[in-house]
């Protein structure tokens, strides 16, 4: 009998294997699909852990002779093998049972994928759909998969969850298509029960995983009824999600019984929260569960829990995506639809989240966040034997925490009622951020120019750097508009400008540090402009508008940068004890000296009002500086994506190729290291003199040929001329691409702004 039993198992496995191959290729099922129900029933091999198949000898011989017999046994052929429950080789047969179950689940999951695929041939798809519906009706496939979720075998449990997710998505699609099919009631009840009872049970984690998988499939789909499908899924779970959210995040860490189950629950639920927010933005649904993270942001409390760092990192990144409205970009195949009218509800929720986050920062959120230097190790914190432990902070978390602070401050500033309130918010929260960053940035930030923090923190991530720069610029513009509304507040405006510098938000400093990071390479700016991302374009346009209005301030900043590099030498980049520690928020910055300063001091920023008595043509620069070629050492010269000076090369380039090669992060890092590594010391610059930055006889306002040193080098002509030369080259490159119809959009407005800056240079 045992020999016959082994034969029957081989028969079933061979039939399943053939069915799997057919389904994998999308082949039409030639035989009656009902014949396969017997072999796809998950209960087929279950009888006290041992196989006990109803089989017939005639059917077995038919299958072994080339599968000529029928796929399922007839009722008169069924015979139960005696003694099957007493299995001497129990472990071997249990292993075979497990393998057959896995094969069954693989066939079912593949079949559901073919049903949902647009590439499957119509006739074959109908056969797979019919077989799936019969499985649901005759053997209650969904209920049996739910029982398998609780199997101690992790692989079986995972495959059952995977099949159940595909089955639920199939039901949602079919319900929308036929308008009468229902989502599995047993599944809804199962989920509601376990999500309401415990926030750290294994069943709750599996429910979260399945729901997440279904929502991902909905977001990735391209059919026009995605919103309706998601609505059908979320409706029975809207209240359940909120109950689970409160249960998970309202407790103290010590109240949880299993740290490992808690970590799994947190990871799964954070991913579900991200998808809920993404569906709100991309599908324009408005469920209460989609607003939980905004209305009840006490999820931030887990940043102080003793949980693995990768969970905290995931939460911080999720908040960052929410504030930037970039949730779900990696799933949805099309960008978020532009709103025909402002979404005031979303704006209100954003403000709530920003206010809560800033309040948490004020009471010490970042002080409690440990930014260790241990690598993530694919989501874990343990370093494997033989792997070298990297030193330094977790830059991913550091960047995300910095960006959400600045972005929250931007949102708050847009809703402040007065300039004084904005100023207090800036001083309070930027002080907290700079204090958080200070121990993690080596070498330390320059004490005389905290604005360097932005380029230092985001040097490896240009997208986040541009978002932070744009938010910082928006804060500055918002407050300056308030000051400009009253002409009697000149002194207060000057104090505000000093405050932006002291708290790392001066837009001119930020822009100049950005240019230094990219080595004043105009092709890097051009690559950003022709990228599919619009963040740099938005930032650049706003800054060019500000530059024309705030020209005197910009010249003063350039003078400050040049004087610091001349007088302090390498002190600009070396750690220096900060005199700003412990100072009051009403910072008073000394005036820049008109003559060389002492050997151990650094000049401070001269403000626009201080420079008003001087002629703008007399902005001073050091005459003797280290001779470095204009574009740096030849071996380190940045390589442009396109040779814009070659007409043939430009004509051969297509716009899509430009867009595909838009990122220059590694170039930015390389050039920044080159600039910071220049051997400029005090001894080399002790003997120096000053001369005008620009002369009236300069051949072109957008030219770097004015007032170079006697040795003919260009580096020492000053930050101002390097900036002007970069903008000149950018303007020329845009013109050339526009003439050849290679620029991806109409750059007329951008060129007009660049011409406006050129006109400012004429008057210098």
Swiss-Prot record:
Residues 645-654 have a biased composition (Acidic residues). Pfam families: LINES_C, LINES_N. It comes from the Eukaryota. Residues 658-668 have a biased composition (Polar residues). Keywords: Phosphoprotein. Residues 615-668, 682-702 are annotated as: Disordered. Belongs to the protein lines family. This is Protein Lines homolog 1. It comes from Mus musculus.
């Amino acid at each position: 009998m045992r020999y016959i039993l082994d034969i029957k198992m081989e028969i079933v496995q061979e039939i399943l294997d053939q069915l799997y191959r057919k389904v994998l290729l999308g082949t039409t099922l030639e035989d009656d699909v009902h014949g396969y129900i017997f072999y796809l029933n998950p209960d087929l091999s279950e009888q006290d852990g041992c196989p006990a198949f109803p089989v017939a000898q005639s059917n077995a011989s038919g299958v072994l002779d080339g599968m000529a017999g029928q796929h399922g046994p007839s009722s008169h052929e069924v015979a139960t093998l005696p003694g099957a429950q007493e299995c001497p080789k129990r472990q071997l047969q249990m292993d075979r049972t497990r393998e057959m179950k896995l094969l069954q689940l693989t066939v079912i999951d593949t079949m559901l994928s073919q049903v949902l695929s647009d590439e499957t041939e119509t006739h074959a798809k109908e056969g797979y759909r019919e077989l799936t519906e019969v499985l649901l009706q005759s053997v209650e496939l969904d209920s049996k998969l739910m029982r398998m979720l609780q199997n101690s075998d992790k692989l079986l449990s995972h495959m059952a969850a995977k099949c159940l997710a595909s089955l639920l998505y199939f039901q949602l699609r079919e319900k929308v298509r036929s308008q009468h099919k229902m989502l599995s009631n047993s599944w809804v009840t199962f989920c509601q029960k376990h999500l309401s009872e415990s926030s750290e049970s294994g069943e709750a984690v599996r429910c979260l995983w399945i729901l997440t998988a279904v929502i991902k499939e909905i977001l990735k789909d391209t059919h026009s009824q995605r919103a309706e499908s998601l609505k059908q899924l979320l409706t029975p779970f809207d209240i359940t999600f909120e109950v689970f959210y409160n249960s998970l995040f309202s407790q103290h860490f010590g109240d949880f019984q299993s740290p490992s189950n808690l970590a799994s629950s947190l990871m799964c639920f954070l991913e579900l929260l991200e998808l809920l927010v993404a569906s709100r933005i991309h599908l324009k649904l408005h469920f209460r569960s989609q607003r939980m993270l905004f209305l009840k942001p006490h999820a931030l409390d887990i940043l102080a829990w003793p949980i693995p760092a990768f969970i905290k990192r995931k939460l911080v990144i999720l908040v960052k995506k929410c504030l930037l409205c970039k949730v779900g970009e990696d799933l949805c195949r099309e960008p978020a639809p532009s709103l025909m009218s402002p979404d005031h509800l979303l704006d209100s929720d954003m403000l709530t989240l920003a206010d809560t986050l800033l309040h948490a920062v004020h009471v010490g959120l970042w002080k409690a966040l440990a930014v260790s230097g241990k690598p993530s190790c694919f989501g874990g914190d343990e370093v494997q034997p033989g792997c070298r432990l990297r030193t330094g902070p977790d830059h991913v978390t550091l960047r995300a925490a910095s960006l959400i602070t600045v972005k929250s401050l931007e949102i708050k500033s847009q809703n402040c009622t007065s300039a004084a309130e904005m100023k207090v918010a800036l001083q309070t929260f930027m002080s907290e951020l700079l204090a958080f960053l200070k121990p993690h940035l080596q070498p330390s930030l320059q004490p005389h120019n905290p604005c360097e923090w932005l380029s230092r923190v985001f040097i490896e991530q240009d997208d986040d750097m541009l978002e932070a720069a744009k938010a910082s610029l928006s804060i500055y513009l918002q407050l300056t508009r308030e000051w400009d509304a009253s002409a009697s507040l000149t002194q207060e405006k000057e104090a505000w400008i000093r405050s932006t510098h002291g708290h790392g938000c001066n837009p001119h400093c930020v822009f100049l540090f950005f240019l230094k990071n990219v080595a004043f390479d105009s092709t890097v700016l051009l690559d950003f402009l022709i990228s599919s991302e619009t963040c740099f374009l938005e930032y650049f346009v706003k800054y060019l508008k500000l530059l024309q209005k705030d020209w005197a301030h910009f010249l003063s900043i350039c003078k400050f940068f040049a004087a610091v590099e001349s007088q302090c030498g390498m002190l600009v980049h070396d750690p220096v004890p900060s005199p700003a520690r412990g100072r009051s928020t009403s910072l008073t910055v000394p005036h820049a000296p008109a003559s060389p300063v002492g050997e151990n001091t650094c000049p401070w920023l001269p403000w626009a009002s201080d420079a008003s008595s001087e002629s703008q043509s007399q902005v001073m620069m050091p005459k003797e500086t280290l001779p470095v070629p204009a574009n740096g050492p030849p071996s380190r010269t940045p390589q442009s994506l396109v040779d814009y000076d070659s007409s043939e090369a430009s004509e051969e380039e297509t716009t899509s190729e430009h867009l595909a090669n838009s990122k220059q992060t590694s170039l930015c890092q390389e050039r920044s290291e080159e600039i910071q590594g220049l051997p400029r010391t005090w001894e080399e610059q002790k003997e120096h003199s000053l001369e005008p930055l620009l002369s009236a006889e300069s051949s072109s306002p957008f030219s770097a040929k004015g007032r170079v040193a006697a040795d003919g080098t260009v580096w020492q002509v000053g930050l101002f001329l390097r900036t002007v030369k970069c903008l000149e080259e950018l303007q020329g490159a845009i013109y050339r691409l526009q003439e050849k119809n290679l620029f991806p959009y109409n750059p007329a407005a951008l060129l007009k702004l660049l011409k406006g800056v050129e006109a400012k240079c004429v008057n210098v």
